[in-house]
Curated annotation (Swiss-Prot):
GO terms for cellular component: ribonucleoprotein complex; ribosome. This is Large ribosomal subunit protein bL20. It comes from Bacillus velezensis (strain DSM 23117 / BGSC 10A6 / LMG 26770 / FZB42) (Bacillus amyloliquefaciens subsp. plantarum). Keywords: Ribonucleoprotein, Ribosomal protein, RNA-binding, rRNA-binding. Belongs to the bacterial ribosomal protein bL20 family. HAMAP family: Ribosomal_bL20. GO terms for biological process: ribosomal large subunit assembly; translation. The keyword Ribonucleoprotein applies. It holds the Pfam family Ribosomal_L20. Coiled coil: none annotated.
Amino acid sequence: MPRVKGGTVSRQRRKKVLKLAKGYFGSKHRLYKVANQQVMKSGNYAFRDRRQKKRDFRKLWITRINAAARMNGLSYSRLMHGLKLSGIEVNRKMLADLAVNDLTAFNQLADAAKAQLDK
């Protein structure tokens, strides 16, 4: 029985890795071994940063809400507590959007939170 070296399958596998490494600098897009290492590392970075992105956006929203809340004489934590007491359930993404694009609506929410905190 003749020896099978798996030429077609191996070549396809290597071509797939080199295609994924397109745009990498230097030998990282030319040499299979180096390209494979970089593709694996890139996959790890992508996996990690898809989760990191969620944390980064939440931090950005909180920063924007805090800045707008302080313009109304409240801290972020007191604003959120006041909104919870008044039964207003608006998520941080929407609050941050209001703080940037519709400050009057945000000010109304802040006033409602203040009213609950002063009770």
